């Protein structure tokens, strides 16, 4: 077995799929670099973080007007959260449904945890084929549905009515993955 290697980009291509910046955050600000280094030196990085994350949850509730009754789950990036949610529903016969093409981790995690994976093709213009999605939900009764919004890798958004129709039809958990919402 050999280590995974990221292929070099062809000439003239720009990598946009990993939410990475080609610019170093401190390249033009030695002062900012020094401030970050000082803060990092004081951080207890030898300890696990507080699992309750109550301070962060309170800040998120205030910043985004999240009701106290709503649960907040935090993780180390969306890959971890997708994995945890998939593990949550993993049992024999359970299914995961996602639009295709979409973020590869939906299919990957379904396969890793032994879940059936149902990929519903997008239309030729990458819009959601809502009748096909609703038909697949009715036929397979997935425990988990992923809607990447805007879709990764196409960048196409779906209407609020379409997303709500998926939520209303799904018998299980619906994850609206807005990792690329800012883009």
What residue ranges belong to the model's regions?
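N-terminal "arm"/small-domain region of PLP-dependent enzymes with the aminotransferase-like
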Residues: 1-48, 141
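Conserved core of the PLP fold type I
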Residues: 44-171, 175, 180-183
């Amino acid at each position: 077995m050999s280590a995974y290697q990221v292929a070099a980009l062809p000439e003239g291509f720009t990598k946009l799929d990993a939410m990475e910046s080609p610019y170093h955050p401190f390249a033009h600000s030695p002062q900012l670099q020094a401030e970050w280094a000082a803060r990092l030196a004081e951080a207890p990085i030898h300890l696990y973080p507080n699992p309750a994350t109550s301070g962060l949850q309170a800040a998120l509730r205030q910043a985004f007007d999240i009701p106290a009754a709503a649960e907040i789950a935090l993780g180390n990036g969306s890959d971890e959260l997708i994995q945890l949610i998939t593990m949550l529903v993993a049992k024999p016969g359970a299914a995961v449904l996602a639009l295709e093409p979409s973020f590869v981790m939906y299919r990957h995690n379904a396969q890793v945890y032994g879940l059936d994976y149902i990929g519903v093709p997008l239309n030729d213009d990458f819009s959601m084929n809502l009748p096909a999605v609703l038909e697949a939900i009715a036929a397979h009764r997935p425990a988990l549905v992923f809607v990447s919004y805007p879709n990764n890798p196409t960048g196409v958004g779906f209407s609020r009515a379409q997303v709500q129709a998926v939520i209303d039809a799904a018998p299980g958990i619906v994850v609206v993955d807005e990792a690329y919402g800012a883009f």
